[in-house]
């Protein structure tokens, strides 16, 4: 009976880890998309600032664009760090799942 309880607990743990691994993969994909989107925004702002000249508009617009660009770059950096953290956790879970699978096999 105790062995059956342990087996059931092991199966539940395996399912929990597998679901977490899948969730991490989805989060990684979502964050990679956010990275791409924000990199595109940075490029857009670069192009925009090439067209805006001091004689054509107020210099404050240049400052706003620079500030927006910096914000987007910061977001890209944050998402890159988050993806790295999620990837590490996913790799750790993969190793643990493999170990649990080998114990049963």
UniProtKB/Swiss-Prot annotation:
InterPro entries named in the record: DUF496, UPF0265
One Pfam family recorded for the sequence? DUF496
Intrachain disulfide bonds: none
Compartment(s): Cytoplasm
Q: Which terms are listed as keywords in the entry?
A: Coiled coil, Cytoplasm
Write out the coiled-coil annotation as residue ranges.
21-41, 67-102
CC annotations in GO: cytosol
- Write out the similarity annotation: Belongs to the pole-localizer TmaR family.
Function per UniProt:
Pole-localizer protein involved in the regulation of several cellular processes.
PANTHER family to which the protein is assigned, alphabetical: UPF0265 PROTEIN YEEX
Give the protein's recorded name.
Pole-localizer protein TmaR
Species lineage: Bacteria, Pseudomonadati, Pseudomonadota, Gammaproteobacteria, Enterobacterales
